[in-house]
């Protein structure tokens, strides 16, 4: 009986380690695809500007399972992104975020955080046109979780928010709360 218990324990431990190893992405290989404003804020999440269809193919081959697109329907990617992503076996999710119309808000930040939590350790790419909206929503999430204004901005920058204009939008949004 002790032997069976030890075997089950070993299988559980090694199975968990294998699953953890599968969930981290080959960040270096993905970065070689030269995606605009590529960031790797987590071992299983990359943040980018708009990838091309070929770049999505590379990411799918390298372990990305889910795509979260923050672009609005009026922004043309030059191809049918949803169809391309799903044809590669990845799930596609869209949270349309418009900067000028108040889209940088707590509801959109929470929607993004809910998806990231739902996907657990699976490989995820989050993108908009440049990566700035990704970072802006992360800033709001960090602030909502108790981070200071400056730490929230720093974390947003780590996720791709490079625009000073958008950093100001985040500051203004957070100061209203």
Please tell me what each predicted stretch does.
Residues 11-19:
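Hydrophobic h-region of N-terminal signal peptides that target proteins for export
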Residues 20-124, 139-177:
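Cys-dependent protein tyrosine phosphatase-like superfamily
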Residues 2-10:
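Sec-dependent signal peptide recognition
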Residues 124-137:
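A phosphate-binding catalytic loop at a beta-strand-loop-alpha-helix junction
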